[in-house]
């Protein structure tokens, strides 16, 4: 199955660690990162899409992406 996630977080080290952890679990970056200002919290937010192929599994809507 092919999986897709969109990782988001504040523009700080925690977001970088989230992306790094995903890369180390076999996820691959997909497309360009995003960067925007959250007017409610008044902080910059980052986003990055990631994809992963998992052999021998079928996708179901109940699939928990963080398990992969």
Annotated model-derived regions:
Residues 1-68:
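Terminus-proximal functional modules
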């Amino acid at each position: 199955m092919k999986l897709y996630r969109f990782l988001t977080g504040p523009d700080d080290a925690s977001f970088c660690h989230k992306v790094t952890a995903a890369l180390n679990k076999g996820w691959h970056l997909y497309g360009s990162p995003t960067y925007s200002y959250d007017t409610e919290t008044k902080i910059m937010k980052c986003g990055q899409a990631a994809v992963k192929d998992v052999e021998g599994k079928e996708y179901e809507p109940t699939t928990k992406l963080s398990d992969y």
